[in-house]
């Protein structure tokens, strides 16, 4: 499965949507997702913009926040085991990534800003 880097400096949100949908077997261009989410150079992509794009593409979403890092990691693994794909806000709420799989005790993390977008991390090392 091929995942993609973000096409602009401000489009990590649409790129993360794109990569999550690829993991589900759907292919959309980042440009289309940028248009649907109204991402822009000044403010990037807010949570509401992510939700808007997913809804317009016909996909559901759930939001969650956790009080502890341990609860967060547990929820990530739980959702991946159920077959869900995650789009997560990181770096002090400034950068979107996707987490698309859990297997053999590793998370498959897709960071569209990195040259090698796919990383395998243990839940313990995730978030550090």
Model-derived features with residue positions:
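Conserved active-site-adjacent core of cysteine acyl-enzyme catalytic domains
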Residues: 22, 32-128
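Active-site nucleophile-adjacent alpha helix/oxyanion-hole segment immediately C-terminal to the catalytic cysteine
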Residues: 1-43
């Amino acid at each position: 499965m091929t995942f993609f880097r973000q096409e602009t400096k401000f489009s990590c949100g649409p790129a993360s949507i794109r990569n999550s949908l690829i993991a589900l077997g759907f292919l959309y261009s980042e440009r289309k997702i940028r248009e649907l989410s109204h991402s822009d150079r000044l403010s990037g992509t807010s949570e509401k913009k992510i939700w808007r794009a997913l809804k317009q593409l016909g996909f559901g979403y759930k939001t969650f926040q956790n009080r502890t890092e341990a609860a967060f990691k547990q929820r990530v693994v739980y959702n991946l085991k159920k077959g869900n794909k995650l789009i997560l806000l990181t770096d002090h709420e400034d950068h979107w990534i996707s987490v698309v799989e859990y297997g053999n005790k590793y998370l498959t993390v897709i960071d569209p800003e990195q040259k090698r977008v796919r990383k395998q991390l243990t839940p313990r090392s995730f978030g550090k």
